[in-house]
Amino acid sequence: MAKEIIFADDARNRLYSGVKKLNDAVKVTMGPRGRNVLIQKSFGAPSITKDGVSVAKEIELKDTIENMGAGLVREVASKTNDEAGDGTTTATVLAHAIFKEGLRNITAGANPIEVKRGMDKFVEAVTSELKSAAKKVDGKKEIAQVATISANSDSSIGDLIAEAMEKVGKDGVITVEEAKSINDELNVVEGMQFDRGYLSPYFITNAEKMQVELSSPFILLFDKKITNLKDLLPVLEQIQKTGKPLLIVAEDIEGEALATLVVNKLRGVLNISAVKAPGFGDRRKAMLEDIAILTGGEVISEELGRTLESASLQDLGQADRVVIDKDNTTIVNGAGDKDSIEARINQIKAQIAETTSDYDKEKLQERLAKLSGGVAVIKVGAATETEMKEKKDRVDDALNATKAAVEEGIVVGGGAALIKAGNRVNLSLKGDELIGAEIVKRALFAPLRQIAENAGFDAGVVANSVSCADCPNYGFNAASGEYVDMFEAGIIDPVKVERIALQNAVSVASLLLTTEATVSEIKEDKPAMPPMPDMGGMGGMGGMM
């Protein structure tokens, strides 16, 4: 297929046109008074959102060069979302502002490579200024403030996330699901829960709740299938003498072994229950080891030269309580050694830091939560499915922003932190490097200007007022139209979100500015389908008989 090659200013201007179109659609969502964007779906009802990355992902432009420009900035939004979980609109607005300012200077004759070098040096300095201005997040109130800002000033979402984080801790897992009613709910699972239910309903002890409830049980962990009762008999005899309940966690229990356990349970000989081990393959072995450490037991594994027949009471784990329903097993207050649990937690944290797979990271995070505190489930309710999806997007954003705030701290929000950090930077640069630094410095005003504009205020006046050098916490509250102490007003942003948004925006804008040629396919207009031939006279075919 033939290719179209465009050079220099023509190429950059076409790329800028695409970036501008994407930015114009995304920027309207910014700030507490940002507007909604309605997105047509290929099937089903249209979706409505105030989430920048959701808007960016839907944009495909007809012109191939424009689409390449938009695609690069779309990548900025997605990458910022992946790394920080929020700040996608900020990243898009910054990338557009830097590209726009840079394009003007490069068209006037500045050297793109020198300009890029100056931009990189300035961003590095701004990033360190942001980190030095960061304030550690302490307590439920600040967590609620961060979550509220990220959820487009919805305080009910902020309070819900703060409560969830207070209950499960910063290492706990918080998941977001759709509720079956119009109300938001928070469910917290104490202890370790895994998604395996009882192997037989005959194990149920609480018929009203359809649950197995075991008080102070022994826990037997085995990493293979149990099919033969003979292997289990020695440990069952020891359990019977203690009079305590027993939970068996194994790859599977079937045939004669399961039938005999059920009969013994029904006759009252043993208070016993059995579940399958969670996970698959190597992950199953790791999770069994987690349960063993949490409960102070050992995994009976043939790989370690142990057989089920050799198991004794010393190999069994213990817990205050175990609750099993048809889908889940929950172990509460395992009797494991605190130092061993802490060592296991640190080991999993190290694995999280090393892994490059998002899936592995998510699974390791779940294991960490189960060992260190628990899991909270936020159920988002709304009157319609469209509203629920929009609200769920905001809850996800708020949750990610909160985690980022706990990780690296917070700075003043509303776009003020970037301006103040830029004003504090003092680099001795010359020539085109200085131009590069000035481009980024001017672009740092773009998020604040957009927030003010969306709220119906004069962007220039607001930017000049907030820019003062000797008022580090001073900023503009777009929701009320007042100038306030941002920390006192609870208008705060996570440093991680601001930092990653800026770094990604400069990265892609500098690539666009140093682009000297574009190569793209020439779209050929396919001829329209010819009209169907006139079928008149077909009705008279009956006369052929």
Curated annotation (Swiss-Prot):
Keyword field: ATP-binding, Chaperone, Cytoplasm, Isomerase, Nucleotide-binding
An example molecular function term from Gene Ontology annotations: ATP-dependent protein folding chaperone
Protein's UniProt keywords contain Nucleotide-binding: yes
Positions of ATP binding: 29-32, 50, 86-90, 414, 477-479, 493
GO biological process terms on file: protein refolding
Pfam families with a match to the protein in the record: Cpn60_TCP1
Catalyzed chemical reaction(s): ATP + H2O + a folded polypeptide = ADP + phosphate + an unfolded polypeptide
Principal cellular location given in the protein's record: cytoplasm
GO cellular component, one term: cytoplasm
Record-listed E.C. numbers: 5.6.1.7
Localization terms from the record: Cytoplasm
SUPFAM superfamilies: GroEL apical domain-like, GroEL equatorial domain-like, GroEL-intermediate domain like
Function, as annotated: Together with its co-chaperonin GroES, plays an essential role in assisting protein folding. The GroEL-GroES system forms a nano-cage that allows encapsulation of the non-native substrate proteins and provides a physical environment optimized to promote and accelerate protein folding.
Subunit details: Forms a cylinder of 14 subunits composed of two heptameric rings stacked back-to-back. Interacts with the co-chaperonin GroES.
Family: Belongs to the chaperonin (HSP60) family.
Record-linked HAMAP family: CH60
Protein name in UniProt: Chaperonin GroEL
Taxonomic lineage: Bacteria, Pseudomonadati, Campylobacterota, Epsilonproteobacteria, Campylobacterales
